């Protein structure tokens, strides 16, 4: 009986153990997503600083060269009706990372049927510009 319990216990430990390669891959992915979220927050902060000095622009795209840094792959902005939309393709875990970096901002959402939904799936009552595709992750300001 004792050996049976011991074998069940050891079997459970072996079954629930995650290999070191999986842990490393998960940590790398989390680090990449966190870095992407940090870049996104910096990007929108630079846009806000730029808009403070250029209040006349209410619509269009602000070129990344205006911020003095090189473009980030798949990270875009568009101004519409004096509102900034920073958007990028969503990927698993990116919304959580962006929420963590933005201190759980209510201005982070995902585009579904041209509407912006928050992290709980609630409609934020915002129609997004035509250039933002469904499934994109948006940081609104």
What role is predicted for each listed range?
Residues 3, 43, 52, 85-87, ...:
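Sequence-level detector for tyrosine residue identity
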Residues 1-14:
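Glycine-centered recognition micro-motifs in short, flexible terminal segments and loops
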Residues 64-141:
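Periplasmic/extracellular, small/polar-rich flexible segments of pilin-like filament-forming proteins
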Residues 13-40:
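Aliphatic-rich helix starts adjacent to a transmembrane/signal segment
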Residues 47-74:
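Short, glycine/small-hydrophobic-rich surface segments
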Residues 33-55:
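N-terminal alpha-helical signal peptides/signal-anchor transmembrane segments
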Residues 1, 58-60, 131, 135:
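Glycine-centered flexibility motif
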